[in-house]
Amino acid sequence: LEEQSFSFTKFSTDQQNLILQAHY
C-alpha cells in the first residue's frame, strides 16, 4: 500500500514537472 502511495506521489510530481516544463 505504501509503495502504491509513493508511486502515485511520484506520478503526481512527474505530472507537475511536465506542466512546469511546458509552461516555460
From Swiss-Prot:
> What highest taxon heads this organism's lineage?
Eukaryota
Write one Gene Ontology MF term: carbohydrate binding
Keywords, alphabetical: Lectin
How is the subunit organization of this protein annotated in UniProt? Homotetramer.
Described function: Agglutinates erythrocytes of blood group A. Binds in decreasing order of affinity: N-acetyl-D-galactosamine, D-galactose, and D-galactosamine.
Name the family.
Belongs to the leguminous lectin family.
The name under which this protein is listed is Lectin
Q: Which organism is it from?
A: Crotalaria pallida (Smooth rattlebox)
